Swiss-Prot record:
It is a peripheral membrane protein. GO terms for molecular function: 3-demethylubiquinol 3-O-methyltransferase activity; 3-demethylubiquinone 3-O-methyltransferase activity; O-methyltransferase activity; polyprenyldihydroxybenzoate methyltransferase activity. Its cofactor is Mg(2+). It comes from Rattus norvegicus (Rat). It catalyses: 3,4-dihydroxy-5-(all-trans-decaprenyl)benzoate + S-adenosyl-L-methionine = 4-hydroxy-3-methoxy-5-(all-trans-decaprenyl)benzoate + S-adenosyl-L-homocysteine + H(+); a 3-demethylubiquinone + S-adenosyl-L-methionine = a ubiquinone + S-adenosyl-L-homocysteine; 3-demethylubiquinol-10 + S-adenosyl-L-methionine = ubiquinol-10 + S-adenosyl-L-homocysteine + H(+). It is found in: Mitochondrion inner membrane. Keywords: Acetylation, Magnesium, Membrane, Metal-binding, Methyltransferase, Mitochondrion, Mitochondrion inner membrane, S-adenosyl-L-methionine, Transferase, Transit peptide, Ubiquinone biosynthesis. Belongs to the class I-like SAM-binding methyltransferase superfamily. UbiG/COQ3 family. O-methyltransferase required for two non-consecutive steps during ubiquinone biosynthesis. Catalyzes the 2 O-methylation of 3,4-dihydroxy-5-(all-trans-decaprenyl)benzoic acid into 4-hydroxy-3-methoxy-5-(all-trans-decaprenyl)benzoic acid. Also catalyzes the last step of ubiquinone biosynthesis by mediating methylation of 3-demethylubiquinone into ubiquinone. Also able to mediate the methylation of 3-demethylubiquinol-10 into ubiquinol-10. This is Ubiquinone biosynthesis O-methyltransferase, mitochondrial. Mg(2+) binds at residues 223, 226-227. Pathway: Cofactor biosynthesis; ubiquinone biosynthesis. S-adenosyl-L-methionine binds at residues 124, 154, 175, 222.
């Protein structure tokens, strides 16, 4: 923009693009030898302005400079804020965020782009409930998860968060996409009971960890791990926010040739069951790979079950075959379980 102290034609076009009314002198900008000279006779010499023209030119030029620098500062601030949103997290993928920003308005359309997720609740909600009740002493059939605190990671518009809240749990839903949280907040506001039980936050899992170490009875990451950047770090964070003995629930897509053909080619490109670009096959993870990450990080795999979606009926079913979708339940070891046999004797 500046060449040898002169504002180039490219710089002029940039100012005009920003909507500035540049002085006519910009067409032939004066040479500036010192940016510290902004007053008196020295300014008239540096800008090559005649003394009797100094007042008008000074006002016009300084006004343009102030506007330009102010605008550039704001642009730099916005750019820094945009980067900060993602730089604070090593698990959030900015490309994935942009994909779901464009889909935020569709969350609660049961016949729309997220219809398979609505239908998946028929499997994943009982899966979470039943496994949590194995270690629960609560016998309230109306609110079986009462007294439990659950973290729903990547909650989106709250499709799974709300059913868990209706079962009596206190649920915190987090998502890096502000548009998703806005939709979720709006939807829960129609139910006064859910409005009290559910909290939503625009943040990453790492940010939640800073204030919620060993705070949750369960962490849910449903259809999330295939979208994160650093899976091992993600699992480590899940472990750290769980109470000893807490449960981690994951539903995701296996990394197989069949999942590529049906999960991406057919579902996204041919049938349009899910929007194009929703999934990246390289990020799919097999049950074996997932277990190899969970176990060294203190999470013992209790259950792995296959799931299959019928696009014609719109329903999900359990299956022994995990080559497409599957659900996993892992448990963080309790404190006493870490003791050596000699110590626990």
């Amino acid at each position: 923009m500046w060449r040898g102290g002169r504002l180039s034609s490219r710089g002029v076009r940039f100012l005009e693009t920003l909507g500035f009314a540049c002085p006519s002198a910009v067409a032939e900008p004066p040479r500036v030898t010192s940016w510290t000279a902004f007053s008196g006779n020295q300014l008239t010499r540096n800008l090559q302005i005649k003394p009797w023209e100094f007042s008008g030119h000074r006002t016009m030029w300084l006004r343009s400079y102030r506007i330009t620098f102010s605008c550039l500062t704001r642009l730099k601030t916005y750019r820094s804020s945009w980067k900060k949103l993602y730089s604070t997290s090593q698990t959030v993928d900015s490309k994935e965020v942009k994909t779901f920003q464009a889909l935020a308005h569709s969350w609660w359309d049961e016949q729309g782009k997220f219809a398979p997720l609505h239908s998946m609740n028929d499997l994943r909600v009982p899966f979470i409930r039943d496994n949590l009740l194995k270690t629960s002493t609560n016998h309230d059939p109306g609110k079986p998860l009462s007294g439990m605190k659950i973290l729903d990671v990547g909650c989106g518009g709250g499709l799974l968060t709300e059913p868990l809240g209706r079962l009596g749990a206190s649920v915190v839903g987090i998502d890096p996409v502000a548009e998703n949280i806005k939709i979720a907040q709006h939807h829960k506001s129609f139910d006064p009971v859910l409005d009290k039980r559910i909290q939503y936050r625009v943040c990453s899992l790492e940010e939640t960890l800073n204030e919620n170490a060993e705070c949750f009875d369960a962490v849910v990451a449903s259809e999330v791990v295939e979208h994160v950047n650093n899976l091992e770090m993600f699992i480590q964070c899940c472990y750290q926010v769980l109470k000893p003995g807490g449960s981690l629930f994951i539903t995701t897509v296996n990394k197989t040739q069949l999942s590529y053909v049906l999960g991406i080619v057919f579902s996204e490109q041919i049938a349009g069951i899910v929007p194009k670009g929703t999934h990246t096959w390289e990020k799919f993870v097999s049950p074996e790979k997932l277990e190899s990450i969970l176990e060294p990080n203190g999470l013992s795999v209790e259950t792995v079950a296959g799931m299959v979606y019928n696009p014609f009926s719109g329903y999900w079913h359990w299956t022994e075959n995990t080559s497409l979708n599957y659900a996993a339940h892992a448990v963080r070891a309790r404190a006493q379980e870490h003791l050596e046999p000699a110590e626990s004797a």
